[in-house]
């Protein structure tokens, strides 16, 4: 059997294969209330029907002010749970495990009213200047990640991913470009890591399942985080109880990274080896053979697929065919599956 279609355990959760749907914002909430819609159900459940092992929902705001836009999913109140529970049941029906990415946009929020960040530095000249978070407000952010994790548990999710990448709030704390604080949340790397550590520990108080963290392994900017900075971060995450790091790049500043097939895989490889922690690789992974090479050469443990799954909900089926495998599909599709 190919490695791509072997089982993988995240703590006590067994994935049927190593294909993960990357969290990708859909901006499709209809009433600006954070509640999942029929679109979200069809969108995510179709990828489970297509054979994906773990489907991770898009960035889901833990605070209303933490949305990227007014059309983001949310878990800041109990009314948002039932629609997500229905969605999770749909994923489970097709044999996929269900993950959710908990997030706070920080200074990248595009919302009416006040936005917040570690320091009062705007994303760019066109963006609103954020208000610097007080220590009390930081503690409330941490508490709201915990509350959202509890609601994720109530909805039946198997995996929680904490979004610490792409220039959103936690990434803003991690990077010296955006964190100019002079208290115990700023300055040395250990201080800049503090909010993420606090969030992980708070989530674990209500959540005993696996925790993934998405990071941006380079800021693509002078004075920003580079790969070598993420090795100690990854070691600290492992010590805090994180199971796997989802390794992306960029998003902190307004610069386009160089993009080519597998362009982020070396970052996942280096963090995996340098910190001794499992990683997920992503970045223009489009074929089964490409995914299999990454796994067999032990460059990552999971394959996280984004845009290719937008183009093709049946990526897993096609990847299996490319690798000479046959995977089970929905029984309703059996006459056309093989």
Swiss-Prot record:
Residues that, per the record, bind FMN: 22-25, 59, 101, 214, 306-307
Keyword annotations from UniProtKB, A to Z: Detoxification, Flavoprotein, FMN, NADP, Oxidoreductase
Family that this chain belongs to: Belongs to the NADH:flavin oxidoreductase/NADH oxidase family. NamA subfamily.
**Catalysed reactions listed for this entry:** A + NADPH + H(+) = AH2 + NADP(+)
Q: State the name under which the record lists this protein.
A: NADPH dehydrogenase
* Subunit-structure text: Homotetramer.
Q: Which organism is it from?
A: Listeria monocytogenes serotype 4b (strain CLIP80459)
Matching CDD domains, A to Z? Answer: OYE_YqiM_FMN
Give an example GO molecular function.
NADP binding
Please give the InterPro entries that the UniProt record associates with this protein: Aldolase_TIM, NADPH_DH_bac, OxRdtase_FMN_N, YqjM-like
Gene3D superfamilies in UniProt: Aldolase class I
Q: Which cofactor does it need?
A: FMN
- What job does this protein perform? Catalyzes the reduction of the double bond of an array of alpha,beta-unsaturated aldehydes and ketones. It also reduces the nitro group of nitroester and nitroaromatic compounds. It could have a role in detoxification processes.
User: What's the name of its gene?
Assistant: namA
Binding of substrate occurs at 27, 163-166
EC number(s) for this protein?
A: 1.6.99.1
GO terms for biological process, alphabetical:
response to toxic substance
